[in-house]
Each structure stands twice: as C-alpha cells, then as structure tokens.
Curated annotation (Swiss-Prot):
The keyword tRNA processing applies. GO terms for molecular function: oxidoreductase activity, acting on paired donors, with incorporation or reduction of molecular oxygen. Signal peptide: none annotated. The lineage of its organism: Bacteria, Pseudomonadati, Pseudomonadota, Gammaproteobacteria, Enterobacterales. It comes from Escherichia coli O17:K52:H18 (strain UMN026 / ExPEC). This is tRNA uridine(34) hydroxylase.
Amino acid sequence: MPVLHNRISNDALKAKMLAESEPRTTISFYKYFHIADPKATRDALYQLFTALDVFGRVYLAHEGINAQISVPASNVETFRAQLYAFDPALEGLRLNIALDDDGKSFWVLRMKVRDRIVADGIDDPHFDASNVGEYLQAAEVNAMLDDPDALFIDMRNHYEYEVGHFENALEIPADTFREQLPKAVEMMQAHKDKKIVMYCTGGIRCEKASAWMKHNGFNKVWHIEGGIIEYARKAREQGLPVRFIGKNFVFDERMGERISDEIIAHCHQCGAPCDSHTNCKNDGCHLLFIQCPVCAEKYKGCCSEICCEESALPPEEQRRRRAGRENGNKIFNKSRGRLNTTLGIPDPTE
C-alpha cells in the first residue's frame, strides 16, 4: 500500500526545496461541491499530487476542497489536466496563480479531511451555501468602487487588512472567519439598501459570506470572483487601474504579495512604514507581527527584548522556560495585544 503521508522531517524537506533548480508555481483553488467520501478522495488526491511533486496545504470535507499548493513549472499543465479529469465537478476549475511568486511557498504536502473547508461556525440547518451573491469581474469591481451606493466589506482577518485592502473598504474586526460572519450581519443592518461587495484573498471566504448575507435578508450582494489575486491579475492584463492598495497577505512562506507600491502599515516596534510580517524568532513565542529591517537587526528577529534575550540562551534552558507555557503561537493585534493561534502562519479558514 502506498505511503499516504509525509515521513521526512520538515528541515530536510525545506532544504531539498531550497536546493531545487526548477522553478515552481504557487497556485490556489477551491470548489464547493459534494464529496461523498472525503477520506477516499483525500487518499486518491494525495497519490496524484505526490506523483507530480506537489507541495502545499489541502483541505477536504463533504462540502468541497480548498488548496494552496506549489507545483513544479514543468508539471503545471499536467496537474491541471489531471485535476480536471479527477472529478466532473472540478472540470474547468479556476486556478489562481500567485502574483508575486518566488516558488518557495511550500516544501511539504499536507492533506487533511475536516468538517468544513472553511470553519464558519454556522449551524443553521436552513442555510443554503449555494445561494451565493453575484460574481464581479475586474472592470465591474472598479465601477463598484466608484458607486456611492456600494459598500466593500473585507472578509479577511485584521492582520491581512492591516497591510492591504481596497479603497475605503470596511474592516470587520475579528481574528477568525467564524467571528466575522455574525459581525458582518450586525454591522450592515442599517445598510440593507446598499450594494454589498464582499472580498477575500482567493474567493473562498467571501463566497460563503455572500451566501450568509443573503440568508440574513441582504438582497444586493456581490463578491469578487477569484478574490484579490484574480482581480489584480485580470486588471493588469486588461490595462485597468488596480484599486487594491498595499500588499495581499498570503498564508505560506511568502506572507505577502505586492499589489501596489504603497506601504500602508507600520512596524509594530518603532512605527516606521513597513508591511512585512514575520514570526518572532524565539521558539517560545513565534508572535506574528510586522517588523522593519532596522528593528529586525536590533531585536535579532524577535518581537521584544525579553524574547531576544531568551532566544540567545542555550537550547536546554530555552526548553526549560517553555515548559508549562500555553501552547500555540500568537498574532499581534494593535487593539488587543497578543492572541493565541495554533500555527506560526495562521490559517485563514480556521
């Protein structure tokens, strides 16, 4: 029976990926469709992806598939053809190609079965996730941005919004998608006469959010097809103004794609203009925060003097100090301080 999970250490896999000479292409895609047996589907896809040397993060559930992956450039078209042939529901599926890609986004393949491909917290049996808002293409997005009756709602987390967003887009203050959904409904109650335009990184969150808004009585709901990634790509291809400002946060080693030259965020340590996220180098912290090059040198990649001092201790002493601490890494939130998460790079679908 073939091995259906990775058995090589992360360090070895990362070193192997960094030594590769062939360029890689970072791709994201999702599809809401019924999967009768997610476990069997997962195992079959794992073999397909492994044969094509695909790395990345893939989630499957009865409601569909959500993937962020890295594919050797020479295998991209073969991957596309085999994915389309895998299930009729996937034929012609839109693949979002990364905008700002060094090919070093992933170095291991992780494929998991979950209850949902997006953790939404919705338990309403009458909710119809297929009753989504209308798609908007790049030119239509720009027209909506100039429409005084349209409100753009950013369905990403606060640390994503902080480094980049559409002009005048509303932030729904939250640390997870499941927190955002009820807040979006609450915040928009007085604006049911407005045109609601929802967006996210690649489309998966705003598509479900648009259905949730319609379920809660909002009738004028749109969402951007393919999210920020596809919007920026199509706008550039069509010679349209790109109205997204700043950087598009992404959930892989790159931590961001440059969309415009503007830097709208600031270093969390000194306040200098900066939009580069990093994780604190102290293994007992791993705070996700924004750090400028000057502070990175001053604090040796750490978020504070305390972490800087601790990271310089002998490994055994560091382990002793970490013993008994709350597990999980953290996210910097300017209004709420440090927040727990379970990954160094947070998962947008949690």
